[in-house]
Design a protein with these regions (language model features):
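Rossmann-fold cofactor-recognition segment
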Residues: 50-65
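Residue(s) in the substrate-gating loop at a strand-loop-helix junction
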Residues: 135
Length: 192
């Protein structure tokens, strides 16, 4: 079993939904939690609710300068959990290129940017825990899920490649593939 007490975990994409819930869980387990997202107000409110030492650092995963500033401000961590996500439901018949591009940029390319700034330090220290949030949709295409499913297939593949490259080091890589969780993102669905 993992010992969380005294560990520093950075949750990126933690202002709501799964990230917010995980911040509470890790806090109850004794971890020092650093939460990040774009919304400073939501992050500040979350930090005030957490039961242990917690702080926040704003980050925009679409902006490499914002990522680099956040990495510098946060400093070395025992673990990083990438939960940042964007979602708009639409399918091939009503293609929305701007939304598709944003989903891929936040969900996949943002992950690549963050890992590029975090992983080298973990490899140098031969220590770290990386958790990447993908989705069950990464395994099979779904109606009205063009950009999201493609981006999550990419996050799954990236996580598997990182695990293959780092499995014999002190850096542990995990991927989680949640099913349907009701969040502000999934509330956009109009299931029939």
């Amino acid at each position: 079993m993992t010992e969380w007490t005294g560990k520093r975990y950075w949750l990126i994409g933690a202002s709501a939904g799964l990230g917010e819930a995980l911040a509470h869980k890790l806090g109850r387990l004794g971890a020092e939690v650093i939460v990040s997202a774009r919304s400073e107000g939501k992050l500040a409110a979350l930090v005030n609710e957490l039961p242990v030492s917690a702080s926040y650092q704003t980050i925009d995963v679409q902006d490499i300068d914002s990522i680099r500033a956040a990495v510098k401000a946060v400093g070395p961590v025992d673990g990083v959990v990438y939960l940042a996500g964007a979602y708009w439901p639409f399918g091939a018949k009503e293609w929305e290129p701007e939304h598709a591009t944003t989903m891929i940029d936040v969900n996949l390319t943002g992950l690549v940017r963050v890992m590029g700034e975090v992983v080298p330090d973990m490899v140098k220290r031969d220590a770290g825990h990386i958790v990447i949030t993908s989705s069950l949709t990464a395994y099979r295409g779904l109606p009205k899920s063009i950009g999201y499913t493609a981006s999550k297939a990419g996050t799954l593949s990236l996580a598997e490649c990182m695990h293959a490259d780092l499995r014999k080091t002190g850096v542990k890589v995990q991927v989680i593939n949640p099913g349907f969780i009701r969040t502000q993102l999934t509330d956009k669905n109009d299931f029939k």
